[in-house]
Amino acid sequence: MSFNIWWLILYFSIVCQAKAHYSLRDFKANIFQVKYQWKYFDYNFGSDEKRQAAIQSGEYNYKNNVPIDVDRWNGKTFVTILRNDGVPSSLNVISNKIGNGGPLLEPYPNWSWAKNQNCSGITSVYRIAIDEWDRLWVLDNGISGETSVCPSQIVVFDLKNSKLLKQVKIPHDIAINSTTGKRNVVTPIVQSFDYNNTWVYIADVEGYALIIYNNADDSFQRLTSSTFVYDPRYTKYTINDESFSLQDGILGMALSHKTQNLYYSAMSSHNLNYVNTKQFTQGKFQANDIQYQGASDILWTQASAKAISETGALFFGLVSDTALGCWNENRPLKRRNIEIVAKNNDTLQFISGIKIIKQISSNIYERQNNEYIWIVSNKYQKIANGDLNFNEVNFRILNAPVNQLIRYTRCENPKTNFFSIFL
């Protein structure tokens, strides 16, 4: 084969790849499957009598149950519900029973933890994390509605037997912004080097801080940075022509196991930032010496929850776009390298939770590229404005294969896909 013919073949291959990129990207949302959906949330109370008693006492009010996060382990699907009046349980699993609103929830690990007498149980959980040691890390902010009722805490369960492994209260001076008196820990990111050498990075969305927990000695440190604070230009959110306002700081975070970069952004901003966690885990560090990096105004809307794949594809909800965006950390952090990989004005209204979960297959040919992205969407604009229609589907859990979402996009790793460098 002559040199010119080889280049001609290469040229047409690149053109075909590029055309596939632009024709397929519009159909990425169809890759997502709705795994669960609800008009409203209800619970398996054990009997109709107990359910009616919960309604009459005000323990349960279907209008006040808002989902935030999802995670999966060994066939169990976890869902978190923000604690408020009428929310009987914040940490739950989806049962196989169906109610009028959708699948019924069951408290995890049991109802006694949901009752939370004398702050011995669980108050309110935004997000959770599961590590490679089959441990469920629960970040409890201790807030019900707008009221602080219990200390913030980390609760760890052994998923193999649902037994408590650890329950650690976050010290008051760590959990709270000493200037404003505000606190709201919302996102835990777990970094496990081994069973004991485990670190947890915690976002304080209202106190504008990153809290670091060392599992080995139960120590905490609170860090502050201008990158954790909201941008006043971007406190207004608009989804499907409906607006609301938030002054939210650091919220969505994701940890790359290859680079050990912790990616994050203040929710009410258009920024994307990161900090390398080796600064925290490899010896003592001084807060003033921490190097925070990233790009300001790189996004065109606010970004919500985040998760990162093994190949370095960082996913994040794009709020006003009702879309899922991504960027591969093996590419320069430039706007041209950020893609929308799925968009749907109905099913992707405010992505509040994202996880990337490996799906084990018995087929040897499917054991690679077996990562699935799981997301929660909750129509937060209607929650904020109090105009949810409980006669229609409001809340969804969806999933999709990561490799199919990023195929023929700039979110593919350029080191492993030759043609992606031309996209």
Curated annotation (Swiss-Prot):
It holds the Pfam family MRJP. Expressed at very low levels in the hypopharyngeal glands of adult worker bees (at protein level); expression peaks at 12 days post eclosion. Secreted into bee venom in the sting apparatus (at protein level). Expressed in the brains of adult worker bees peaking at 12 days post eclosion (at protein level). Expressed in the spermatheca of adult queen bees (at protein level); expression levels are higher in mated queens than in virgin queens. Along with Mrjp8 expressed at very low levels in the head of worker bees compared to other major royal jelly proteins. GO terms for cellular component: extracellular region. Induction: Unlike many other major royal jelly proteins, not down-regulated by the ecdysteroid 20-hydroxyecdysone (ecdysterone or 20E). Glycans are attached at N110, N118, N177, N196, N345. Keywords: Glycoprotein, Secreted, Signal. SUPFAM superfamilies: NHL repeat (SSF101898). The keyword Cytoplasm does not apply. Residues 1-20 form the signal peptide. It is found in: Secreted. Component of bee sting venom. Component of royal jelly, a substance produced in the hypopharyngeal gland containing proteins, free amino acids, fatty acids, sugars and other nutrients, which is fed to developing larvae by worker nurse bees; may be present only at trace levels. All larvae are fed some royal jelly (also known as worker jelly) early in their development but it forms the principal source of nutrition for larvae destined to become queen bees. Belongs to the major royal jelly protein family. This is Major royal jelly protein 9. The lineage of its organism: Eukaryota, Metazoa, Ecdysozoa, Arthropoda, Hexapoda.
